[in-house]
Each structure stands twice: as structure tokens, then as C-alpha cells.
Amino acid sequence: MSAALSPPQTSVSDASRLDKLPRLSPRQVRIFFWLLAIALGAAQAWATRFTMNPDGISYLDMGDAYWRGNWHMAINAYFSPFYSWILGFFMKVLRPSPYWEYPLAHLVNFLIYLAALGCFEFFLRNFIRSRRHSDENARKQGNVTLPEWGWWMLGYALFIFASLQLITLRLITPDMCVAAFVYLASALILQIQTGAGTLRTVMFLGIVLGLAYLAKAVMFPLALVFIAVAGCCAHNVRQGVRYAAMAVFGFLLIASPFITILSRSKHRVTFGDSGSIAYEVYVNGVDQFVPASSSLKHPINKIHDMPPTYEFGGPIEGTYPLWYDSTYWHEGIRPYFDLAQQFHAIAASLVTYWRQFCSVFLQLNATVALFVLYLIAPRSSACLKCAGASWPLLVIGLAAMGLYALVYAESRYFAPFIVLFWLAAFSGVHLPHSRGLVRTIAVVVVAVSITSIAQTAWNTPSEAPSTADYYRLATALRDYGITRGSKLAVIGTEPFGKSGAFSARLARAQIVAQIRSSDLFWAAPAITRAEVLQALARAGVQAVLASDLPTSADLSTGWHRLGTSTDYIHVFGRDDQ
């Protein structure tokens, strides 16, 4: 029975036939995937060049504040500074017109994507180098693993999918910056694990993690995971302590100045409040935009009860103050633990992860491929043991996904960590050396790569490039006297969209008031709508913007269509006699 279950032996003639199987040059694979990654990234950046998102408005506002020296506005405990520095630099140097402002932001995103591509190349090179010793031992034992060209192909396919499908260049967010730093830090940890690392390597690791923290506050706790893993990769306890201490020093060298400034501005020690606010919103159920609590230090001024209407003209600046610095408006609320709420949040995150791994539109291809390769192995447990050799990547990837699971998991957040997880998981593939299984591995790798790239290419917008709707509406606003510094109000639960913050940013206007429900406003009697508008006028609002109007909306009382859009404006002093 044991003989029947033992792996088939490879004879000399079999080995010679295996050597005659077609082989791909790793260099050719790398060049092809570099060109493919650049082409797909450029196509996505171009197709989405006129799009904008809420976070992007705040980062653009913050970048402007940093580069003009408005430190009171620039220091922000909700949005981290690094990405805004980059955006602000390009805006200050190139000074784009309103038409080109959002396309320039997407160009910056594309450049960061290229930097992430370079960081991933460095990481994948170190990962493959770290695999050579174990792969050589596997061959000596009569086993076969992924060939080097297979690692390059699979790695780049996963990178392209994670970068363009999960993070995307459509969104103006720092997630691509974070991905670049995660790949760079992971490469340095692999150097330490293989014995190629020095104190200089560990120092650089700390610096990279410090920059990652400046890109996104969640990297502060995750930096501790990276540093702990780096210490555990050392050859002995004494060296591990030295490595951890040096990494902490490098991290604090970069992070401590901003932590000090931020703590002084908040009058308490903090490395950022985005995590606590996320917990309030996604776990405790606090309203993101208009929090309600008797403990609020800065309650938002409610100027009309029904429909609920709020004014928030100061002291926070930015195109939309409620989103620019949520920490000010949430100050006084303390997140609290509730078992039922926590269970619900974790369950929602697990559903997100389930979809990530098991949806045909995401990464079911990789999940099925991995299961197939593990199941055809003589002992699947041996594959798991081999994957354990890549434990640093597994620990980092699972720690990040676990941290997000406690609050809120979104694909762009965990994208680089899922790449680490997949590479570590596929490193466990060890099959008996035979012609059929060598071809099976090759076919599986090619299939996963092709399907991942095909999904990404399919979802990259291929229709005519999106039009400059926000610019056209900003131009229409100027026709109604809306200029730099004008105070606006919007109607809707979230003031984003063509006639909201996205157009207000290009007009350099500020949204200082909001009617929270479009349906309630337009369904109210005419006298009630007039009272709401009068309250907005008394609050210093110059004009009210409305979009997504119901068909029954009464536009006879001074509402004007903005250009050829479906958005409308009411200008005080002109439309209310």
C-alpha cells in the first residue's frame, strides 16, 4: 500500500524528456508584463481622467493648503499627508486650468502606479530569490514547483489585478502609495529572512514603514507587525532585538515629527483619528456626516428641522468641511465596544473576503487553481508545510486583513496584502516530478494569469473617454456669479456629484450648508421650502445647488438649469424677490 502511494520516480530518460519541454524566458515574461501593466494602467487613467471621488476633493484641498503654507488647514487627523503633498506639488508646479485639474490628478495616480510597479519588481525578485533554495531541495527530492517564469507571470498578473481591479486609478486615494510601500517593505523582510539583510536594511525598512504611515494612518499598527516579523526573521534573539530596535528608530525618524505636530494640534497624543471614526461609523452606527450625540464638542448648527438643514461654514475650511476633517465634527464621541455590533462588522467583512476569493468576477480563478494543485499532491499537508516557509508574507497579509475585518474591509484597502497571501499560498505547491504534472502547473499558472488580466482589461472602460461634466458645471456656476470663495448649499444626503463638491472644487467655491433630504425638501409645501431657503440666506449662503430632482419638483420659484445638465441652481438676491 505504501509503495502504491509513494511519488513516482523519475528516470534519467524521463528527466531528459522533461528538459525538452518548452520553456519561457523569465526576462521575456517580465518585459511583456511590464509593457502590459503600463498599457493597461495608461488606458485606465486616460478613460477615467475626468472622474473624481469624495476623498480626492479633500486630498486636493489639503495639498493646496500645505503648499501655500496654510498649516492650520493643512494639519488633518483624518486624512494622512503624504499623498496630498504629492498632489499639491504637481498642482503648484504645473498650475493646471480647471479643465485639466482632475486629469492631472489622474496622471499623478498613474505615476504612483508606475512607482508601485517598480517596488513590486523589487519585491518579486527578492521573493523568487528566497524560493531558490527550497525549490532546489524540492528538485533533489523528486518534486516540482512553479518554474521561475511562472512566478514572474503569476506575480505580475496578481499585481495588475490588485492595482487596476481592486485599487484602480479611477479613485484619487493614497491606496496605490500604500501598496508601493507594502511591496517595498515586504521585499526588505525577505532579504532579512534569507540572511541578506543588514542593520542598514532594517533601518531602511523602518523608514519605508514611516512613509507608509504618512500615506495612511492604518500603517501605524501594521508597521508594528512588519517590525515584529523582521525581528523574528533574525538568526537569534539578540539579533532580532537589534533589528526591531533599528526598525523602530527608522520608523520614528520619519513618523514622529508629524505625530508630534498632530498631537499638539489636537491637545492629546494621537497618530490619527481615522481609525476611531471608522469604528464609530461602521461598527457603532454613527452618522459620518452629521453625527448626533450630547457629548459632541462641535455640534453642527441645525438651522431648520424639517427637512433637516445644517450650516457648517466654520472654522473648518475645504470645499466640503464636513468631509475635509471629520475629526473636528466627531470630537467628543468615543467609540465603544458592543459584542453584537462587533459581530455584525466582522460578518460583513467576512462576506467581503468570501466574495473576493469565491466570486467569478474577482479571484475564484486563483482559489480554484490553488485547490486543484494542492489536491493533486500526494499529501496536501506537505504543501501547507511548504507554504509555511513563506510565513512572513502570510503573517503580514493575514494580520492586515484581520485588522480591516474588525471595522470595515474594502478591496482597495487590502489589495497589496492579498497579493502577498496568494504568492505565499502558491509557494506551497510541491508535486511529484513528472511530465504531466509539470505541464499541469504550467497550464494552471497561465490560466490564472490570463483570466486575471482578462478581467482587468474587460473592466477597464473601453468606451469613449468620460466627458468633463464637472468642469462644464463649474463654468455654468461662474455664469451665475459663483466665484472663488462663494458660499454654497446643496440638497442631498451626500453633497457629491456633478452639482456638488466635485464642481464646487473647480469653481473654488465652498459648500457651507446642506439640506439632508432631497425628497423631503421637494415634497414639502411651498411655504416650507421658502422658509428653508430663507434660513440658508441668513446663514450667508449665496446659492443652492440641486441634482437628481424628482419629476414633481416645483422649479417655478427661481430655480435655473445649469447649462444642458439636469442640475439646478437658486441664487439669493437674484431669485428671491
Task: Describe the role of every protein-language-model region.
Residues 48-62, 73-90, 96-103, 266-273, ...:
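Extracytoplasmic catalytic/substrate-binding loops of multi-pass membrane glycan-assembly enzymes
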Residues 54, 79, 167-178:
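Short acidic/glycine- and proline-prone juxtamembrane loop motifs at membrane-interface regions
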Residues 302, 467-468, 475-518, 542-550:
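Short periplasmic/luminal acceptor-recognition loop of GT-C membrane glycosyltransferases, typified by
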Residues 284-382, 514-517:
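Lumenal/periplasmic acceptor-binding loop at the mouth of the active site in multi-pass
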Residues 144-146, 185-202, 212, 230-234:
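Membrane-interface transmembrane helices that cradle and orient dolichyl/undecaprenyl
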Residues 107-143, 184:
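Transmembrane-helix motifs of polytopic, lipid-linked glycan transferases
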Residues 161, 188, 201-217, 223, ...:
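Membrane-interface alpha helices of multi-pass inner-membrane proteins
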